[in-house]
C-alpha cells in the first residue's frame, strides 16, 4: 500500500508536470491524493503539509527543467522519498530530511526566478512561507518548545539570502541543460547544514571546537564560491 501511494503520486507528477501549462493540474491532483492518504489520521495537518510542499516543489522543478532525462530522474527520487515518508515517523524530523525539503524549496523558487522571471517580492514571499511552514512542522514533530521562533528565524535568514542572491542571479548549468542549479540553492543548503548541525549538536551536548571550525570552513567556501562564480553585473 505504501509503495502504491508513492507510485501513484510519482506517476501523476511525471505524466502531467512536464507538459507545458499543466503544472497546476498536477499539483491539484497530487494534493487530492495526499489529502486522501492522510484522511482520518491524527494530526492531519502535519501529516499532509510536508508531502504537499515536497510534491509542489517537485512539480514546479519538473515543469521548469527542459530535459526528459532530468524529469524522469527527479520523479524516481521523489517516488523513493514519498515511499520513505509513508513508512512511519522514524527519521522524519531529522536534519537530512529538513535539508532535502529546503533544497527542493530553494530549487523551485530560484528556478521560477530564472525561467519565469517572477518578481523578486513574490520569490521572497514564497521562500519565507514554505521555509517557515516546513521548519515549524518538523520542529513541532520534535516537540521543540521554541519551534515557532526557530522557524521564523530561519525563514527570515533564507528570505534575506533570496533577496540578495536575486540581485546577481547566477545558475550553474551542465551542457545541454540536463542540470540547472541556481547558486542560491547551494548557498542556502550549505547554510542550512551549518545552522542545523550547530543547533542539533548544541541540543545533544556534543558541540565542539572542531565542529565549529568545520562550519567556519564551509562558510568560507560559500563566500569564495559566491565571489568567484558570479558575473557581478547587477547593482543594489
Question: Language-model segments: which ranges?
Answer:
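N-terminal topogenic module of multi-pass integral membrane proteins
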Residues: 1-88, 204-236
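Transmembrane alpha-helical segments of integral membrane proteins
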Residues: 191-204
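Membrane-proximal helix-loop-helix units in multi-pass membrane proteins
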Residues: 69-76, 84-164
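C-terminal ends of transmembrane alpha-helices
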Residues: 46, 165-169, 199
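Hydrophobic membrane-spanning alpha-helices of multi-pass integral membrane proteins
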Residues: 154-159, 185-193, 217-224
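Short alpha-helical packing/oligomerization segments
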Residues: 167-190
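Hydrophobic, aromatic-rich alpha-helical transmembrane segments
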Residues: 3, 40, 44, 48, ...
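Hydrophobic alpha-helical transmembrane segments in multi-pass integral membrane proteins
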Residues: 63-64, 108-120, 159-175, 222-236
